[in-house]
Amino acid sequence: LFRSLECTETMRSYFPVIPFFGMPGWLLAAGINRYFRCGRIPLKASFGVLGRNIWNRISAMLVHDIPVILAVGPNFPIPHKRHKLMLYEKNGRGTYQPSMEISAHFVTVTGMDENYMKVSSWGREYYIDRQEFLNYVRKYSSFLVSNICYIRKK
């Protein structure tokens, strides 16, 4: 229990959460960069890539075994709208079944093919339809808030 509390406090020092707002992507990138500097890790993080480059950047990060943090941002510019992005689970027959909807949530991309991103959310495996993600971003959100934390070598 003590180590868990210690870990939580350490994380809070790098990643402060803004009450009622959460953590915007730029604040996540700033916390990761602070962690890299303190640990003398020769990497740099920034939030956001051009929409047309997102799939290439995700692929490159996965190939280099760099964690890909994907923000499925809130509705933008009006965050209290209720539009969400579907997460899918893959059944034993290899078909994708709708599981739950998300917005204003970070997930970790662990794999990608032509149609789906394999993601982890709270330790569970899901899939995001790549075209549905683009549609969500373009119609209900924005690449300003729905994007990746791009990590690369300095």
Each model region followed by its residue ranges:
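Cysteine-nucleophile protease catalytic domains, especially the papain-like/related folds used
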Residues: F2-I66
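Residue-level marker of positions within ordered structural domains that often coincide
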Residues: R37, N75, E114
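Noncatalytic regulatory segments and standalone regulatory/sensor domains
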Residues: V63, K81-K154
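Short, hydrophobic/aromatic-rich beta-strand segments within well-structured domains
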Residues: V68-A71, T108
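Generic short beta-strand segments
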Residues: A71-P77
